[in-house]
Amino acid sequence: MSDRLDNQRVVRAPRGPEITCKSWLSEAPLRMLMNNLDPEVAEKPEELVVYGGIGRAARNWQCYDQIVAALKRLEDDETLLVQSGKAVGVFKTHRDAPRVLIANSNLVPHWATWETFHALDRAGLMMYGQMTAGSWIYIGSQGIVQGTYETFVEAGRRHYGGSLAGRWILTGGLGGMGGAQPLAATMAGASMLAVECQPSRIEARLRTGYLDRQTADLDQALAWIAEAGAPGAKPVSVGLLGNAAEVFPELVKRGVRPDLVTDQTSAHDPLNGYLPAGWSLERWERGRERAPAEVIAAAKASMATQVRAMLAFHAQGIPTVDYGNNIRQRALEEGVSDAFAFPGFVPAYIRPLFCRGIGPFRWAALSGDPEDIYRTDAKVKELIPDDPHLHTWLDMARERIHFQGLPSRICWVGLGDRHRLGLAFNAMVASGELKAPVVIGRDHLDSGSVASPNRETEAMRDGSDAVSDWPLLNALLNTAGGATWVSLHHGGGVGMGFSQHAGMVIVCDGSEDAARRIGRVLWNDPATGVMRHADAGYDDAIACAREKGLDLPFLG
């Protein structure tokens, strides 16, 4: 669609205390929408693509302009409705209602396929919102760094006596999500070999400090990895220009043994996200326009080849995990009957955190001043003094993570801490300690906000993997509680037909009204995750629910 391409337009969120909307409650979503399209943040801002293949912030540039205009005239007792990246209505509500309600990429289940989506997308009736692209709370690769770091650290505990020092990880994909992997690996003490087919993505990760080195030579890459494995050597992350469907099997053939194997290519989208083996980027780009069925068939066959290599590593006893891009499902569809022999990362490493409502809590400084983030970092340490792992993360993040767009931070905290931090940040705005309001949000990948049987809800204890009532309830409760904007999406992470998920963002503007909303929303949101896992029979979640005094009738 030509109305999606504008090479002349550069979008950047305003900074500072002056606003162009009628209040911070509408200025905040305006700035975060614009921040999603900042060239420092977005993968292809000229096409409105933020990350994740074709995850967009708005349906087309006309729709973007209409959203911006609607936000600038929005009153504090009105709510803007956004349907798959298009502003479709402004309605009278009340001051504590969300200023924006967003629904992206949702399809009736029988029609929830990429084929149906692409037809609607080509007709200009829909866009793919991914998770935080269409919900306007993407913060660049930092948004996934800590979750990836936590996963790698837990893998070290589980498989290697507590540490990944001297070990190395093999992966594919350095896009908006996958680009977090190299930095997360070296933070966790491991080296990484990351295979990426697009030079621009490797260069972007080098530029932002997420990646240490690049090469197109596999032997050179392996030599660097070997050097970093020597006693006393520092871990290194290497971006290898190549195709994972070719490199992974070659490593198996050579008898190379990584210490952990995973993948974050955009396999969720076989048309736009995965380069078929043997194809050039130019052939791939032409094929997507002229012969999409051929591209999809070739991509899925290549995914099957990569998964067979991952299964070979798994059979050798090497820890191997799916990192949530649905590559196992694609391989299964191509006849790899044992594609699910290795687990997803959530049941393997993350679910115990979800049982306590712990997940990706993120915030951004609307002032644009990094000092506001550093002050909030200090506040987190002050309010959670007895978590050395969290403190280590915050110290490493300040030292090693480059801000992309508006300064922001992510840290994994849970029920009981999120609302305390939110209230503290709001008080810092009120006192003038922060130069402008902050927004608090999260990934849709959280404990109570997603149904995704091949990722977040894989292998639930009670078999409820595919029950999607939970993210709907999460969105409804956050709307009732007064989040500033709430989103409900389909297909994020794993593609059409495989997930439903909800997001929320709340503004800390220093007001007493904001404090009341924050107290409700940032308690209720993680509490739904504890509720969901308690209902599934997880003892840790049941204990957490009782400890926190949650009123869950099924517990008696």
Swiss-Prot record:
One Gene Ontology term from the biological process aspect of the record: L-histidine catabolic process to glutamate and formamide
Compartment list: Cytoplasm
Cofactor: NAD(+)
E.C. no: 4.2.1.49
Co-factor binding comment: Binds 1 NAD(+) per subunit.
GO CC field: cytoplasm
Presence of keyword Lyase: yes
Similarity comment: Belongs to the urocanase family.
Xref: NCBIfam families: hutU, PRK05414.1
Name of this chain's protein: Urocanate hydratase
Organism listed in the record: Rhodospirillum rubrum (strain ATCC 11170 / ATH 1.1.1 / DSM 467 / LMG 4362 / NCIMB 8255 / S1)
